Structure formats: structure tokens, C-alpha cells
């Protein structure tokens, strides 16, 4: 699947019961029902390790698992996917599947997601001299983030998160400014919008 090496294929079911046991506190009340409403079943499809693909491990990363999650609905709750991503204590690339569409998701300081695509449109490349760099490349492939010179991957992810936050604040303020009838308040909002835009340029 997605051009990953055949030698990495394992296809091992991951039962929801394991998640219910590990996250009993987090899935209390109706949260378990919400999880069940999102997730149909899960299968570990690939294990990318030194043994399976002949790319050396690092101290931090001994393997990267690919987990296919069959969804019951397309508009799932991110919190459920974040819980799944932390289950192993290992690096996990998640393939979300709904009807004929796939979405890649990966957790690196926060949940990062690609656009929904058809299977034939997705190609995962094992780029890197070790599993650490393969993981970093998976993160950039999924998120579309370009790491700027002088930044680490994590630093760039934080920069992108700050940019997204500023862009949302700008959009919210622009909407309020359009509705505002008092000229003084409208002017103050326009000034704040300009400040946010200048800040967003600093982060580019």
C-alpha cells in the first residue's frame, strides 16, 4: 500500500478493547461511545524497522508502525486519533480510511493531517539514512511543512501552528469588523488586524 516495501507488511488487527483498557479514564462516560461512533476497526499494516527495510534504527526510534483506521464517519474527532497515536509509545503513521478516500495523519508535538485523497494519489517514500530521518520525512510528507533554514522540524511545526493561530484571529476579526457599525471600534479592529498580519509575516 502507498508504495511501501512488501517486506514491511504485517497486517495485524489492533482490537479496540486494548484502547478501552489503556484509556479507561479518558474514555469514561460518553467518550467511549464517541470513540466507537468514529472508529470501526484498526489494522497494523506495516512495520518499518531495520529488520524489515534495512534502514538503521536510532536511539529514539527502533520502528515506525503504519496503522490503518477504518472510520464510520468522515467528520471524526481529532482527540480519538491523538489517543490512538499515543497508544504504542512508538512512532505511528496513521492511515484513515472512509469509503474510497484516505487521509494520512501523524503526531509530532501535535496532530498533523494531509488532505483526503484516493489510494492511487498517495505515495510514501522512505527517505533517510536512518529511521529518525525517515520519520522526519514522513512528517513533512503528511503535513506539507517545509523546514526553513535554521529551524528544527519541531521548531517549524511550532512556527506553522502560530501562523495558523494568527490567521484564524485575522479571519475572526475581519468578520467582526465587517459587522461593526461604530466607526471607532471598526478602526481599532482594522488596526489590530494589521498588527496580526505583520506578526504573521514575521513567522513566514
Language-model segment annotations:
Residues 147-161:
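Short, charge/polar-rich alpha-helical segments
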Residues 1-88:
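N-terminal, leucine/charged-rich tether regions that mediate assembly and partner docking
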Residues 183-194:
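Short, charged, amphipathic alpha-helical segments
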Amino acid at each position: 500500500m502507498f508504495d511501501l516495501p512488501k517486506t514491511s507488511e504485517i497486517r495485524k488487527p489492533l482490537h479496540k478493547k486494548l484502547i478501552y483498557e489503556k484509556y479507561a479514564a479518558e474514555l469514561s462516560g460518553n467518550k467511549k461511545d464517541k470513540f466507537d461512533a468514529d472508529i470501526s476497526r484498526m489494522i497494523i499494516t506495516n512495520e518499518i524497522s531495520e529488520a524489515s527495510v534495512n534502514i538503521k534504527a536510532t536511539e529514539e526510534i527502533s520502528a515506525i508502525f503504519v496503522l490503518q483506521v477504518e472510520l464510520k464517519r468522515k467528520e471524526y474527532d481529532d482527540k480519538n486519533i491523538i489517543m490512538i497515536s499515543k497508544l504504542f509509545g512508538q512512532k505511528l503513521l496513521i492511515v484513515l480510511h472512509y469509503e474510497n478516500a484516505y487521509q494520512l495523519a501523524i503526531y509530532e508535538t501535535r496532530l498533523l493531517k494531509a488532505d483526503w485523497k484516493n489510494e492511487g494519489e498517495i505515495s510514501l517514500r522512505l527517505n533517510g539514512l536512518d529511521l529518525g530521518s525517515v520519520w522526519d520525512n514522513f512528517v513533512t510528507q503528511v503535513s506539507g511543512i517545509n523546514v526553513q533554514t535554521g529551524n528544527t522540524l519541531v521548531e517549524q511545526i511550532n512556527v506553522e501552528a502560530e501562523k495558523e493561530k494568527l490567521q484564524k484571529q485575522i479571519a475572526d476579526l475581519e468578520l467582526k469588523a465587517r459587522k461593526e457599525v461604530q466607526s471607532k471600534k471598526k478602526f481599532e479592529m482594522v488596526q489590530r488586524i494589521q498588527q496580526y498580519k505583520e506578526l504573521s509575516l514575521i513567522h513566514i
